[in-house]
Amino acid sequence: MINNVGIDIVENKRIKLKKEFIIKVLSTNEIQTFNTKTKKQKKEFLAGRWAVKEAIIKTLDQAISMNKIDIEYVNQKPVIQNKELQNILISISHEKKYAIGIALKQSDNK
């Protein structure tokens, strides 16, 4: 059962490729992936992570730093790797100038 929903959209041009911002948003594992991308891909990657992590945070009862949330692709789908957040389903989408993230938090009661 879904008990909370978060959604966020960001315009890619608002994303700055500054070290401080990258460290604020991305986990250590995500930074490794980020570093393999072209400049355009980096902006899109960072925008997507920002949007989906904002969406995740909106579903939570307590604050968490963005860089503590680790997302990897499994079977071509984004999956939160943090054990304590695995009850949250996510999706990231890109459309021309925008990235959007959605998070659906499932209740522990089935």
UniProtKB/Swiss-Prot annotation:
Transfers the 4'-phosphopantetheine moiety from coenzyme A to a Ser of acyl-carrier-protein. One of its GO terms (molecular function) is holo-[acyl-carrier-protein] synthase activity. Its EC number is 2.7.8.7. Pfam families: ACPS. The gene is acpS. One of its GO terms (biological process) is fatty acid biosynthetic process. It comes from Mycoplasma mycoides subsp. mycoides SC (strain CCUG 32753 / NCTC 10114 / PG1). Its main location: cytoplasm. It is found in: Cytoplasm. Mg(2+) binds at D8, E54. This is Holo-[acyl-carrier-protein] synthase. Keywords: Cytoplasm, Fatty acid biosynthesis, Fatty acid metabolism, Lipid biosynthesis, Lipid metabolism, Magnesium, Metal-binding, Transferase. Its cofactor is Mg(2+). Signal peptide: none annotated.
